[in-house]
């Protein structure tokens, strides 16, 4: 299933992800958007990277 961007941001903020390991909430949203398009079933294997 897919989350909406604002839904993800709200949950991430509630889980104190803003600033986690120096990563801003905006950067987490960007990362999730690019890696999975907010698809909760997506798996990225990072082949050799």
Swiss-Prot record:
Subcellular location: Secreted
EC number(s) per entry: 3.2.1.17
GO CC entries: extracellular region
Keyword Acetylation annotated: no
Known partners and oligomeric status: Monomer.
Additional free-text comment from the UniProt record: Lysozyme C is capable of both hydrolysis and transglycosylation; it also shows a slight esterase activity. It acts rapidly on both peptide-substituted and unsubstituted peptidoglycan, and slowly on chitin oligosaccharides.
Protein name: Lysozyme C
Species annotation: Pseudocheirus peregrinus (Common ring-tailed possum)
